[in-house]
Each structure stands twice: as structure tokens, then as C-alpha cells.
Amino acid sequence: MITNSFDAAEEAGILPEINIELKRIDKEHYILRHSDNGPGIPEDFVMQVYCSMFAGSKFRNIQSRGQQGLGCSGCVLLSQMTTGEPARVISCYQEGDDLKGVKMKFKMDVKKNKGMLMEREDFPAEHTGVCIELQFKDVSYSMAEQGAFEYIRRTMIGNPHAKITFRDPTGHKYIFKRAANIVPILPKEVLPHPKGVSADDILFMAKHTDKRRYKSMLTSSLSRMSNKRVNEIEELTGIDMNKRPKDMTWAEAEAIVNCFKKMKFMAPPSNGLIPIGSEQIEKGMKQILKPEFIATLTRKPVTYGGGVSFIIEAGIAYGGDSGRVVNEQRKSEIMRFANRVPLTFDQGSCAITEALKSIDWKRYGIKDFDNSPVTLFVNIISTQVPYLSTGKQSVSPEPEIVHEIRQATMTLARKLQKHLRAKKAAKEKAMRSKVFEDYLPVIIEEAAKLGETAVPE
């Protein structure tokens, strides 16, 4: 729901502001209230947003926070399955010159994949935004890495332009202040690259295109695809490119994709990728971690798998509140992100973890990495993040991705090494000065004796 609120606000040019309240009403029974300052949802679309699973378009090849097509509807379903209670939504939105407000209570019809309205009420709205209230059972609140608090904390580092106020079940109120006042540039939709599509993708294009021939369907649906390249595919596969797309078979789609693998294409355009930016990452890390040292960078766009563009962003923070506290001791912390969204599960199998663990940290002045007050930040930006599983919480260890993460992090590690060396040198200098200060009275006294003069005051 946080990512949905961010996306809606940014599309409207609004700096996101979210209020979250998690109230415990019994053991493993909670009420969640989530409200934002976005543009609101028109009444006709409220139940579509909250009650339709996989409502997004399969072929929007655009960098997005959303991962699974579940989002808010998944939350509504879980609430309904564990408590039987309906969702309650208040939406305030602009319709022409009028500011409208509607209160709705509804449930999800799972079989029909749509909402069932139970109650609705108009009311005078004062501002735009959405508030949703859900109940959950058989869940627990935790301060662990996979818990709500940690998710919000990490979200703020990847989204420093937002403000989130969170009241936890104990009544404690956390205010995560905005560290940047710039609404991010919206990413542009780009055509898929031939090296990044599957046979299923090609078949989907064929069944949903308005083009009349394979040739025009391929040139209009894929980047870096010209009539000349289509003619090459026709020669290599023997498939008639003047056939109707709706008649395409799985075997033909598979043959076309296998042909793509043998061909060379220009790298895809990278103007559809919008990174957070090193300056914004630094602001976010400083706001949350308050470190003694910080360094960030954004790498140039490159490709993996022969044709999928991606950008790696990295940050390293040392000292202050960096790292995580375990048994009252600060240990190292790895923060993994994909398109600004924290990945809090399946850390061990992730390419980001693999890349960071493969670095020899002793070379950079960190003798015991696991027990050092350091936080590592890595964000992968792509229209097609290569997740390892359907859970979409860990990134596949593609060689190009692992290489980029290592290069980015080692560049920052060298800067940290300089800081640690300077810190060590300053400490040694201070120790030498202290030794001199301790012996100074003795030296003065002995010098006075040699000069047969009185000891100066």
C-alpha cells in the first residue's frame, strides 16, 4: 500500500505523505489504518483497485515499484480470509471543479475477481487522499528485519522525498521526516528488447496486437527491431512473416525467441530508467542513519542477458546509527532494493548479498565485516528485474549484475578506507600529543634544573 500511495502521489506531482496506524485489539489481531495525501481514487475505480487481482497490464515495459500485481487487493484478501471483516475506504478526489468525498465498505468476490459493495456514503471532502482500514488475524508485529518498522525505515532511505508517520501497536509514534523536496521524475515506458522476451511474451503480443502481419507486429512491439532484422529472422527460421499474428503457434514463438538468442542487437535505450540519484540516496541515509562517514554513487546503464538495461546504485555508511543492533552490539547491515522497494526476505540467495559477501573487506580497513557498524545500500533499477522466484524478494545472480554491484561497492569502500586511515592517523597523533603533554611538566622541571632557574608557572 505504501508503494501504491507513492506512485499515485508522484504521478500527480505531489510529495508523498503517509500516516500508518497499527492497533492491536487482541492477541494476533490487529487493525491497520493507512492514509495518504495523494490525488484520491474516483468512486468508480475504488473497488477495482482494492478487489481486482493482477489488475495491471502484462505488457507495460516500465520501471515500477509494483512487483506482483497484488498490492492493495492482496491486503484486502488476506484481511477477509483471516477475519471475515470488510474493507473500509474513504476516498477524496477532484472531479472537474468539485472536490468529492465517499466512504465505502465492501468485500472481495474472489471467484468473480471484483468487489461487493455493502455500504456507501457521500461526505464533504476538505482535501484529496485515500484512507483504508483493514483487520488482520493470525499475524504478529515484530521489530525484526522482516517486520513493518524495518520495512518503513528502509523505504525512507530509498524514497527520501516522502514523509511517513507510523504509530505501532505499543502506541509509540515514529516520524520519518522528508529529507528531499523534489518529486522524482516519472519513468518512461519503453518497448521490450528482443533479448529480454520469452516465447510466452511473443505469443501474448501476437494475440493482443492490432497489426495484421508478424513483421509489423514485431517491429512495433520490440525495440531495436527493423524490417531488415525481421527478414533475417524469416531466413533463419523459415517462418512466413506475412502471416496473421493471431494464428501464431507456440512452436513459432519459441523459434523466434531462439533466433533472437543467436542474433546481435544494439543495447536497448536506457531513457526509461530513472535512478534515485547519489545525492538523494545520501540524504536518505543521513536522515535515518546519521553516520560519521557516508559515500554514494549511481553507475551508468548497462545490460544483462544480452539486452535488458539496468542501473546499479550503491551507498555505504559507517558509524553513527549504521548497522543493526544485535544483543546490544552493532553488526553490519545489507539493505537490498529493486526500483526503490526494499527486499526484506530471501537475503541469502540474492545476487546483491552474493556480490557484497564476495568482497575482501580487510583490504579496505574493515577487519571483521560482520561485526562492524556499517550499512551497505544497493538498488537495482530496471524494467525487468531478474527475480529468482515468484516471491520476488531476491535478485538472480546474473554475472553482469554481480559485477556492477561489486564495482560500485568497491569504489565506495576505497573512500571508506581513506576515512578509516585518516581517523586512525588522527587517533595516533592525539595519543602522541597526550604522551608529550604527560611528560611536559617533567621536561620543564629538568630543563629548569639544567639552566639553574626557577620552574616557570
Spans of model-derived segments:
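GHKL-type ATPase core
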Residues: 31, 45, 56-197, 204, ...
